[in-house]
A protein has these predicted regions:
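Extracytoplasmic cell-surface/polysaccharide-interacting catalytic and binding patches
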Residues: 1-50, 121, 139-142
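Solvent-exposed, polar/charged alpha-helical surfaces in well-ordered, non-transmembrane soluble domains
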Residues: 42-45, 49, 94, 98, ...
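Catalytic cores and adjacent binding grooves of peptidoglycan-active enzymes
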Residues: 75-84, 88-157
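Short, low-complexity, charged amphipathic interaction modules
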Residues: 150-175
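Extended, low-complexity, intrinsically disordered C-terminal regulatory tails
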Residues: 41-71
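Soluble non-cytosolic domains of exported or imported proteins
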Residues: 34-41, 90-91, 159-162
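Sec/Tat-exported extracytoplasmic proteins
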Residues: 48-51, 100, 104, 172
Length: 175
């Protein structure tokens, strides 16, 4: 798989349900190309096939200027065409995240409105924008009905006890 460059605004069919323009940077006049990781498109198509509903892309590629203007992370995977913020109408974000993890997606952020996925090679999950990134180990890691986690024992705090990482369990941090 590779990251490909497309001319912003030019529609190219990438898979059965996704077109290049869905990934275009939303910045105005700041860039002319769109970077898209083929692996990301494959993941999104698998998610679309599994749920049988449209996967809406809030944000795909972001050029550096637009990413800075919206307060994006300085090393955001969006700037490399390796990330998408998505939602599926009438599907809980946690359900989409659980499926994303089951198909091998390693970068997953869960928000009230949807999820962030990316093609990073290190396993990272986070919940809501206020939480710190937490490196995780084990599979699967995202649980909807997790026991209450005492986050006072860890440096990186989790925003919601509904999300549990096997790493915490292995360290005895879910008393």
């Amino acid at each position: 798989m590779a990251i490909k460059t497309y001319k912003k605004g030019t529609e190219v069919q990438l898979s059965t349900n996704f077109k290049s323009t869905e990934f275009d940077c939303h910045g105005s006049g700041c860039c002319s190309n769109t970077l898209i990781d083929e692996k990301l498109v494959n993941y999104l198509q698998k998610i679309r096939n599994h749920f049988g509903k449209a996967v809406n892309i809030n944000s795909g590629y972001r050029c550096k200027t637009h990413n800075t203007n919206i307060g994006g992370a300085s090393k955001s995977n969006h700037m490399d065409g390796e990330a998408a913020d998505i939602y599926i109408n009438s599907i809980k974000p946690i359900e989409v995240a659980q499926y994303a993890e089951s198909i091998g997606i390693l970068g997953i952020g869960v928000y009230s409105w949807g999820i962030h996925i990316d093609t990073r090679t290190t396993k990272y999950f986070w919940y809501d924008g206020g939480a710190s990134n937490v490196a995780t180990f084990g599979n699967p890691s995202i649980k909807e009905e997790a026991p209450k986690i005492d986050t006072s024992k860890v440096e990186n705090k989790v925003a919601d006890p509904k999300v549990m990482w096997n790493y915490f369990k292995s360290k005895g941090l879910n008393d």
